[in-house]
Amino acid sequence: MKDTLALLQKFNAHPDSRCWYVAWNPKGTLLASCGGDRAIRIWGREGDSWECKTVLQDGHQRAVRKVAWSPCGNYLASASFDATTCIWKKKNDDFECLTVLEGHENEVKCVAWAPSGNQLATCSRDKSVWIWEVDEEDEYECVSVVNSHTQDVKHVVWHPTQELLASCSYDNNVCVYKEEDDDWECRATLEGHTSTVWGLTFDPSGQRLASCSDDRTVKIWKECQPGGGQDTAWKCVCTLSGFHGRTVYDIAWCPLTGALATACGDDGVRVFKEDETADPDQPVFSLSAHVPKAHSQDVNCIAWHPKEAGLLVSCSDNGEIAVWNYQSEV
């Protein structure tokens, strides 16, 4: 491995608490983090370091599991173990809680905005995925509840350009949803993992989906058209096994370089690179860079910067955020 993953900065983002998730705003000027302390922190770059700009701590009664920026960057959604999702509106340098989305019976595990910004998806330990629509008056309405999983739903992610949604679950499966006659339904179930699927990420084109699991593997799924007017199918074209020592909690496909990064329960951060000479229907990924003890505890999340190639952040059970620079020798 000639490629490098260098630590730029490490800071205690959520003291005495887990840092569950980090998310860049679309411009990459702000980073939101959330944790077991019920707080959301907004970080901005000051010179070469990242400083806390504001703390949002009145929205939730329990841990905040995930945060997500709207495509326009003016709204932040937060999903909490208190079974609610808060929508925060950015006003100058501050944020106000605009509305609270209620309805899930148990912890909300994830929230994600559609690329249009007009729809939002949430998922929960109650085994359901909810689709919400937002109008020009910032009113949110649940338009569909899908119960395609048989266990706790861990993560939801939207296709980068289409109104297509994917979710993954404690039931070991991935579901892909499309809207049909004003209702959302599961159009494909991706089976292959042997334990909980924790995270999902689309490649920049949206033609492939990567999943990561408690079975310590990463799977790459490719969309294929069966023809004859049938539904699109997703086929597993590659499995990365033998690289991770414990559960793989999160995975992120770099929108700029196509590199694939993982966050793992063995405290490591890894970056995989695709062999561009390989057959697209049989892709080959190699381990490009690995920091074995990126954090002193489980790594929960990994996120590539949307505008700066090679810049990525990770966060951990020890409350820390780490900023990394990945450099690949072509």
From Swiss-Prot:
GO biological process terms, semicolon-separated: iron-sulfur cluster assembly; protein maturation
WD repeats (start-end): 14-53, 59-98, 103-142, 148-187, 192-231, 243-282, 294-330
Keywords associated with the record: Repeat, WD repeat
Coiled-coil annotated residue ranges, if any: none
Database matches in InterPro entries: CIAO1/Cia1, WD40/YVTN_repeat-like_dom_sf, WD40_repeat_CS, WD40_repeat_dom_sf, WD40_rpt
Record SUPFAM superfamilies: WD40 repeat-like (SSF50978)
PROSITE patterns cross-referenced by the UniProt entry: WD_REPEATS_1, WD_REPEATS_2, WD_REPEATS_REGION
Cellular compartments per GO CC: cytosolic [4Fe-4S] assembly targeting complex
Task performed by this protein: Key component of the cytosolic iron-sulfur protein assembly (CIA) complex, a multiprotein complex that mediates the incorporation of iron-sulfur cluster into extramitochondrial Fe/S proteins.
Family that this chain belongs to: Belongs to the WD repeat CIA1 family.
Subunit composition and interactions: Component of the CIA complex.
Record HAMAP family: ciao1
Annotated protein name in UniProt: Probable cytosolic iron-sulfur protein assembly protein ciao1-A
Organism listed in the record: Salmo salar
